[in-house]
Amino acid sequence: MRTSNHLIGLVNFLTFLLSIPILGGGIWLSSRANSTDCLRFLQWPLIVIGISIMVVSLAGFAGACYRNKFLMWLYLVVMLLIIAALIGFIIFAYAVTDKGSGRTVLNRGYLDYYLEDYSGWLKDRVSDDSYWGKISSCLRDSGACRKIGRNFNGVPETADMFFLRRLSPVESGCCKPPTDCGFSYVNETGWDTRGGMIGPNQDCMVWSNDQSMLCYQCSSCKAGVLGSLKKSWRKVSVINIVVLIILVIFYVIAYAAYRNVKRIDNDEPAGEARMTKSHPSHFHL
């Protein structure tokens, strides 16, 4: 029994350590929500899951140390629910960020972003005028476009140098007009609109050289936010999938050790056949 308790304690300690990357991923997304992506709701489920794993693993660790079978049982039940929630969350994150990506542009190092390339619930949420008002205000306050400017020994960046840059989705979608507008480059956030092509892209009419406006109300800016969010979530999802696989392995080990503790407490010999007519087998915690 002591060996099984030690094993359960070790598994719970390792599970506690596994909660750190999940919680760290949620905190990282939260920091980006305040400065880059400006979407402040998707990170909270991840933070809650990370904290829950921490608390439950500590309860299981205490149960193993003090041989409290109730705490061990509670760990197994709640951890099973957490694993199910993490699976659902990973599926949801992939589903809402599945479609959409930037379009390559001839002779440009950056991509252009178009809202029609995205679809689903997340696009509808970002497209909502009242919600977008909060996001665009966050983008302005974060100075996303102020950081785009560059100079070399006091010399401003030339058009050719700018065109070869790899801009982030937010910088490309919110800080410059779409390439198909045909505006002439003046500086990173200033463009000569004379002689441009006002075609079917409505963002060409929305663009403003006013530094407080730029393309914050453009559909391309909304698409850029979605593109940035997709990149962030895909990075975090890879970590979550790895953690999920390890969690499942640890859970199976903890369950086997818990069953062994119960078997010893009930004075059942190892390898006892439980499939008999008088003693049918029951699968229970």
UniProtKB/Swiss-Prot annotation:
Membrane topology: Multi-pass membrane protein
Extracellular face residues: 28-43, 93-235
Keyword line: Cell membrane, Glycoprotein, Membrane, Transmembrane, Transmembrane helix
Pfam families cross-referenced by the UniProt entry: Tetraspanin
Glycan-carrying positions: 34, 187
Chief location: membrane
Ranges per topology, Cytoplasmic: 1-6, 65-71, 257-285
One BP annotation, GO: auxin-activated signaling pathway
Domain of life assignment: Eukaryota
Transmembrane segments: 7-27, 44-64, 72-92, 236-256
CC per GO annotation: cytosol; plasma membrane; plasmodesma
Localization of this protein: Cell membrane
Function: May be involved in the regulation of cell differentiation.
Assigned protein family: Belongs to the tetraspanin (TM4SF) family.
Protein name: Tetraspanin-3
Record organism: Arabidopsis thaliana (Mouse-ear cress)
